[in-house]
Design a protein with these regions (language model features):
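Alpha-helical transmembrane segments
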Residues: 18-22, 71-74, 248, 408, ...
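Hydrophobic alpha-helical transmembrane segments
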Residues: 55-65, 174-177, 381-398, 468-489
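Hydrophobic membrane-spanning alpha-helices of multi-pass integral membrane proteins
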Residues: 240, 341, 348, 432-447, ...
Length: 625
């Protein structure tokens, strides 16, 4: 079977659906049907190719694209009602185009087609981020995202042009693909773009698109640096540690649900980076356990993150649909009003924190094993340091993530409503709940099927050496399944037990207050305040306190705002420098056509000189693309 033809057919179906949705834009219902039909048919054809083909690491990137594309297009019709449904033709055009381009990125095997698909993916998703373009905040977020996409594309072009230098190639790969992943200082677009984009788009971008940065590193970077694998392995581990701790710490003071989830995505990209780094160290040393557990743990965590984080972003959209807001301090008590969505949010949050028996624990367990294997490598002190640092960071990150998600769960779903909108919220339609349930059930299936998949992907000659790791993985999967089954059984038994007497329901004990008010309960910010105070300026939080004065003080206040330290201390200063530089170059805009032609001619001459007089550049330009 020719799988390339199947993928080409899938891209064609998605593109036809996109064009049809745009053409029928004046009839929103028709454009919705055409767009959904084109995307779903393309996903089905792609899924046939994935299932019928041989086991391939690329499928770890294709499966999230297909699953989240399906969940997103399933979720979108009800979500768009009252949220831009009259522009559904434009929405489905760019949504289909984004999914098709993401799939195309995983198909293209040569630099130029790969870069073309990469650019289409960035531009199409930019249009989706800017869907509510009339909002000043959305417009700002969209332009920041577009700048990041274009900067990443330029760096990747330079990466391919510098293919003769291994060091430069990998460094540019880390920067170019790191802009998509959200590596330190390259992450600033994530907390801006995700809150601005529609919820299905945020789910697709966070769950599948940013992980394509790792596909780029795996596809183009790792093969090129086999002889330098130790050095670059430590580089990825260092970046992973900063992402893990920095991402989750920066999430603490955030009050917007999707902003917090965006920082959580940075943390999870750090976990994947740790696995990739340990795998590279294993390549340099020839350690089979490190290679397999590192790369397998990273790949499996990509899939788990896609399922869990995609579900959480969709649930954030459900909350926004029900309350009209994403500010968690305006919510409260939604678990009573949205029991299915609230329960799924809490379950996905526990899973993403890496707690057993959920699926993310299984992938992190593999990375733990890779770290323990690094500690036992003889004669390598730095390997021992990595073997200690990685498990410690993973454990610490899991605890901090649990605290961050406790903040969200408590502020949004527990307690009493803090606004009229939260008090009047109702459960979202079934078509918005089923996609999230599908993602969660897929995550449960991943937990059970991981040991079998591990044996399938492991080379035959490695099976004997990997037997202890695979055996431990089987025990984790069986234990997780048993605990989950026991929990479900207890819930069913509780529901079936006869009740001897009627349960009296009354208000919560008010501790002596005659009229308790929602203002008296802890907010999410108050809950997480000890950790924010402990982490200090790392969280980006700034406080302004007006202390009471005099014997009869009239007023006092406490204000806290948070800014991303990377944006505040690096990018804003960098932008100011370039603005000043651009102002000094205004003289080039003389308004004379012949002067512009002279500049273009000079640039063309310089490109020709660079391309034909430099031997390595000429060779690359003639045969490398």
């Amino acid at each position: 079977m020719n799988f390339e033809n199947l993928y080409a057919a899938a891209l064609a179906l998605m593109s036809i659906g996109a064009a049809g949705a745009l053409a029928a834009g004046k009839r929103p219902a028709l454009s919705q049907v055409i767009g959904c039909a084109g995307l779903i048919s393309g996903i089905i054809v792609s899924a046939i190719s994935v299932c019928a083909g041989l086991p391939d690491y690329v499928n770890l990137f294709r499966i999230p694209i297909l699953i989240l594309g399906l969940a997103g297009v399933w979720f979108s019709p009800q979500y768009l009602k009252g949220h831009g449904s009259q522009r559904s033709g434009i929405y489905y055009f760019f949504f289909n185009l984004t999914v098709a381009a993401m799939l195309g990125v995983t198909i293209m095997n040569r630099p130029i087609p790969f870069l073309v698909m990469w650019e289409i993916m960035g531009l199409a998703s930019f249009a989706l981020v800017a869907f509510d373009y009339k909002s000043r905040q959305v417009a700002r977020a969209a332009w920041i995202y577009l700048l990041a996409c274009q900067a990443g594309g330029m760096v990747l072009l330079g990466m391919f042009l510098m293919a003769s230098s291994v060091e430069a190639f990998f460094i540019l790969a880390v920067i170019g693909f790191g802009l998509k992943i959200g590596f330190p200082l390259l992450h600033v677009w994530l907390p801006e773009a995700h809150p601005a984009a529609p919820a299905p788009v945020s789910a697709l971008m966070s769950g599948a698109m940013i992980q394509l940065g790792f596909y780029g590193i795996w596809r183009w970077g790792i093969n090129a640096v086999a002889s330098y694998s130790e050095m670059f392995g430590f580089t990825l581990i260092a970046l992973g540690i900063i992402c893990c701790l920095g991402g989750i710490i920066l999430s603490f003071p955030r009050t917007n649900i999707k902003t917090l989830l965006a920082y959580s995505s940075i943390e999870n990209m750090g976990i994947i980076s740790l696995g990739c780094g340990l795998g590279l160290l294993g390549l340099g040393k020839g350690n089979v356990t490190m290679i397999f557990c590192g790369f397998a743990g990273a790949g499996l965590h990509m899939l788990n993150h896609a399922l869990l984080k995609g579900g959480l972003f969709l649930l954030a959209g459900s909350v926004q649909k029900a309350t009209g807001s994403l500010e968690m301090e305006k919510m409260g008590g939604l678990l009573k009003r949205m029991p299915v969505s609230g329960s799924l949010f809490l379950l996905n949050s526990a899973g993403l924190s890496g707690l057993p028996p959920f699926n993310a624990f299984v992938s992190e367990f593999l990375i733990y094993l890779a770290g323990f294997a690094a500690f036992t490598v003889p004669g390598k002190p730095l390997f021992m340091v990595a073997g200690v640092a990685v498990p410690v960071v993973l454990a610490l990150t899991g605890g901090l993530a649990a605290a961050a998600f406790c903040k969200v769960g408590g502020a949004v779903f527990l307690g009493e409503p803090r606004s009229k909108e939260a008090a009047e919220a109702v459960e979202v339609p079934l078509s918005m709940r089923l996609p999230v349930l599908l993602l969660f059930l897929c995550g449960c299936a991943v937990t059970v099927l991981t040991p079998a998949a591990a044996r399938l992907f492991a080379p035959e000659e490695w099976i004997q050496e990997l037997y202890p790791a695979i055996r431990a993985l089987q025990m984790v999967a069986v234990t997780s399944l048993a605990v989950t089954g026991l929990f479900v059984l207890l819930v069913l038994i509780k529901g079936l037990l006869p009740r001897g007497k009627e349960i009296r329901r009354s208000c919560t004990w008010d501790c002596g207050f005659s009229k308790p008010d929602a203002r008296m309960e802890y907010t999410g910010s108050a809950f997480i305040q000890p950790l924010v105070f402990f982490c200090g300026r790392l969280t980006g939080a700034k406080r302004k306190i007006t202390h009471p004065q005099g014997s009869f003080p009239e007023k006092s206040s406490f204000e806290e705002e948070s800014a991303d330290p990377g944006m505040e201390f690096f990018w804003e200063k960098s932008f100011k420098f370039f603005f000043r530089l651009a102002a000094k170059l205004n003289f080039l805009q003389s308004g004379y056509l012949h002067f512009y032609i002279l500049i273009m001619t000079a640039a063309l001459v310089l490109m020709l000189v660079w391309g034909f007089l430099l031997p390595w550049a000429g060779t690359l330009m003639k045969g490398g693309f």
